């Protein structure tokens, strides 16, 4: 990618259909779309191009963390591209979730595209990799439980 993008790659020991379901169904999103120990409330989930999504997460300090965006592109079992704001910490980014079947496994390439290189560097210093790492660990656990 470029100097504005953070890329995270994960391989899930599950079919692309199952990973897609876990990624796109609100009842599953509520189980994994937050760091460990935090429950996600799916407030809005209009899964179509132009549709909005909004998830709320109560933080241990009593504040509420809001994740929201709008779907830009959806290609079933292949990719989901969305605008995204993670308030109060990160705003004005694009997230690209790219799924690839590899035998009985699914490879995920997750790109976080920032408006500037400086913003990307700031987000890395704030621990963005640890946050998403925890989220994808929870997704992996959910997929294994469903499977």
Task: Put a short name on every predicted segment.
Residues 1-39:
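Hydrophobic ligand-binding cavity/cleft-lining segments
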Residues 3-9, 16, 40, 52, ...:
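Intrinsic-disorder/low-complexity, polar/charged segments enriched in Ser/Thr/Lys/Arg/Asp/Glu/Gln
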Residues 19, 29, 53-55, 71, ...:
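Hydrophobic pocket/interface hotspot
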Residues 14, 24, 50, 76-77:
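A generic structural motif
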Residues 114-147:
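A conserved amphipathic terminal alpha-helix motif
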Residues 30, 44, 58-103, 113:
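Hydrophobic-ligand binding "helix-grip"
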Residues 24, 106-109:
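Ser/Thr-centric signal marking residues that sit
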């Amino acid at each position: 990618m470029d100097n504005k993008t953070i890329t995270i790659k994960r391989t899930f020991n599950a079919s692309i259909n199952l990973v897609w379901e876990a990624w796109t169904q609100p009842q599953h999103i509520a189980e994994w779309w937050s760091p460990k120990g935090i429950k996600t409330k799916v407030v809005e989930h209009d899964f179509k191009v132009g549709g909005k999504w909004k998830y709320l997460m109560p933080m241990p300090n009593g504040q509420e963390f809001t994740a929201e965006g709008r779907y830009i592109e959806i290609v079933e079992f292949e990719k989901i591209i969305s605008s995204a704001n993670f308030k109060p910490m990160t705003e004005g980014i694009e997230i690209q979730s790219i799924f690839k079947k590899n035998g009985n496994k699914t490879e995920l390439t997750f790109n976080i595209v920032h408006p500037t290189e400086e913003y990307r560097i700031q987000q890395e210093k704030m621990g963005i990799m640890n946050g998403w790492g925890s989220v994808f660990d929870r997704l992996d656990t959910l997929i294994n439980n469903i499977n």
